[in-house]
Amino acid sequence: MHRFFKSEFFNFEFIRILSAAPYGGAEIAECLVAAGQITNDDPESWHRAWIIQADKAKALGDEALHSGDTVSARRAYLRASNYYRASGYMFHDRPGAPDARVLPLAQQVLDTYALTLPLLDTGEASQLKIPFENYQLAAYLYLPRDRTKPVPVLLSLGGADSIQEELYYVYAASGPQLGYAVLTFEGPGQGITLRRDKMHMRPDWEVVVGRVLDFLTAYMQQNPSVQLDLSRVAVVGASMGGYYALRAAVDPRIGACVSIDPFYDMWDFVRNHVSPALLNAWNAGWVPSRVVNGIMSMAMAASFQAKWEVGLAMWFFGVDSPTQTLRHMMKYTLARADGTSRLDQVKCPVLVSGATQSLYLEPESDVLRVFDALAHLGDERREIWIARSPEEGGLQAKIGAIGLVVQRTFRFLDQHLNVTR
């Protein structure tokens, strides 16, 4: 496949932005101009290139709205929101390495995206606040315009580095047109809850989704006109969001689960990136944490991708050293302490996918392990999809093949939620 950047990381993230083009989140020429202004592995040039395009798109949206052209305004605001997201993507704002630009850029994404909501032509959209412990989780509910009968609900979960405004370009842009209500939200360690509220990540996503389902039940009782069919609720997520979807699927209120390119155990991911011998020696107490921290710090200094990945994990876990990050990663697994799998509690149908050209994961050690742990469902209620080439979904999270993953997801959900058109 054609490459735009020498860096695998920058190339992947650029394709990620391009992937939003069919759904209004990018314009090809704008992206190519931005690419020409970006220096490989230079986060500042990445930021500058995308902020320029974001400001231009925002101005075009304002101009179109002023003249009464709501179609062009919607398209421009969607692009601006995505470009603002991209402009801040390479930055972190953790206590040990603060960056004052992170929160204002996140707010620009929110403010610009809010301008699109009344202009969307794919259905109705509203902003919600979901009570969770001592916080309010930001959420969007997208509804089909035709709700003469109750509609199934899809919970679209973000992952480690996505924000829910970006999730629009995947399922929220298509779901309402196919007769589904789609709910997105940002849980602990995600999006604005991390940047503004300083909520850090947690592995037990069944608890988070459980609160969301409780909220939807109360919301439906208070707003019956939304016509949500809470007997037909599905969950979908990609990468870490795929792990979250599998954790959520243990809730008996979930009627179907789609897990796109998940990991089974985050520690396996670590072992693929750091010497297993070093990790084993450190974990056994033979090598002190300061030595591992020093080695990982040198790796971060030598590679921007490593610096970004470790820095992101330190940020969303709320820790200040690489070894503390490793300790937290051990908690993110589908295995119980006794060696059994949490997936034995899943009773709903599950579609799980893998990507052989993933930037991060190995299908053989992750997706097949997930699929095998779902054997109790039988072949009628579990499905596996391992994609090999980019156009077939071979990149992580099916980046570059959004239309295909949307098609396969809703085909699976239609079948198992008894949706007919």
From Swiss-Prot:
Q: Which Pfam families match?
A: FrsA-like
Which GO MF terms are attached to this record?
A: hydrolase activity
Q: Spell out the protein name for this chain.
A: Hydrolyase poxO
* Record's function text: Hydrolyase; part of the gene cluster that mediates the biosynthesis of oxaleimides, cytotoxic compounds containing an unusual disubstituted succinimide moiety. The first step of the pathway is provided by the HR-PKS poxF that serves in a new mode of collaborative biosynthesis with the PKS-NRPS poxE, by providing the olefin containing amino acid substrate via the synthesis of an ACP-bound dec-4-enoate.
UniProt keyword annotations, A-Z? Hydrolase
Q: Is Hydrolase found in the keyword set?
A: yes
Q: Which family does the record assign?
A: Belongs to the AB hydrolase superfamily. FUS2 hydrolase family.
Subunit structure, interactors included: Homodimer.
Q: What is its EC number?
A: 3.7.1.-
Q: What induces it?
A: Expression is positively regulated by the oxaleimides biosynthesis cluster-specific transcription factor poxB.
Is the keyword Nucleotidyltransferase in the record?
Answer: no
Q: Which InterPro entries match?
A: AB_hydrolase_fold, FrsA-like, FrsA_esterase
- What is the top EC class of this enzyme, as a single word? hydrolase
Pathway info:
Secondary metabolite biosynthesis
Per the UniProt record, the lineage of the source organism begins with: Eukaryota, Fungi, Dikarya, Ascomycota, Pezizomycotina
Please name the catalytic residues of this protein.
S239 (nucleophile)
Q: Which SUPFAM superfamilies match?
A: alpha/beta-Hydrolases
**Signal peptide as annotated in the record:** none
Q: Which Gene Ontology terms describe the biological processes this protein takes part in?
A: antibiotic biosynthetic process; monocarboxylic acid biosynthetic process
Q: Which PANTHER family match?
A: ALPHA_BETA HYDROLASE PSOB (PTHR22946:SF13), DIENELACTONE HYDROLASE DOMAIN-CONTAINING PROTEIN-RELATED (PTHR22946)
Q: Which gene encodes it?
A: poxO
Coiled-coil blocks: none
User: Disrupted gene: resulting phenotype?
Assistant: Impairs the productin of oxaleimides and leads to the accumulation of a trans-decalin containing alcohol intermediate.
